[in-house]
Amino acid sequence: MRRISRITVAGAATASLALALAACGGTSTDSGSESKGDKGLAIAYDVGGKGDQSFNDAAYAGLEQAKKEFGYETADVEPTDGETDADKEQRLSSLAKQGYNPVVGIGYAYASAMKNVAAKYPDTTFGIVDDATIEAKNVADLVFNEQEASYLAGVAAAKSTKTNTVGFVGGVDVPLIHKFQAGYEQGVKDTDPKVKVV
C-alpha cells in the first residue's frame, strides 16, 4: 500500500512541478527582467529536504527533468533544523538576488516568507507548493488535489489487502494531510466496505 501511494504522489508531483516550472519560466512583467539576465530555475526545499522519499524528492526530480528537457540552469537549497520564517525569507531573497527566476518554495511553510520576498522582487516570478493564500501578480500557487491521488492509493490498497485491514500514516497533523487521508479512506470504502483502515 505505501509503495503505491508514494509512486502515485511522487509521479503526480514530479510531472506537475516540471510543468509548473516550465510555465513559471517567464517573468512576471516584461520590463527589467531581461536586462539583469535570469539565471534559471531555483527551488527551496521544505522540512526533510532532498532524500525524504516524498514531496521534496519529487520536486527535485521535477527540477532535474526541467533542466534536462529545457536546458535550464538550476539551483536548489536545503532547509535547516529549527529555521524561522526569517531564515526562509533570507533563502528566497538570496535566490532572487542571484537572478534565479522562477523561485519555487516547496511547501506551505514558505507562505509568510514568500509574501514578503515577492513584494521586494516584483520582477521575479515565485511559485509556492500547497498554498493559495498569497495574492500577488508574481506568485503562482501550485496547489494539488491530493485527495484524488490518495483516493487511487486507497483503491489499490483495498484491492491488494489479504487481511481486510490497511493502514494510513499521515506524517503531520495539518489540513492538507487530513484531505489526503479522507481521499484514501474514501477510496478504500468505495472499493470494499469490509476493509478497515487503521
Descriptions of predicted regions:
Residues R6-I7, L21-G37:
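Bacterial lipoprotein signal-peptidase II cleavage site
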Residues G32-E34, L41-E69, A75-K88, G107-Y110, ...:
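Extracytoplasmic "Venus flytrap"
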Residues L63, Y151-V198:
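An alpha-beta-alpha
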Residues D85-G99:
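Short, well-structured alpha-helical segments in soluble
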Residues K97-G107, G127-V129:
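Periplasmic-binding protein-like
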Residues Y108-N116, K120:
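Hydrophobic alpha-helical
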Residues A119-V143:
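Flexible loop/hinge segments that line or gate small-molecule binding clefts
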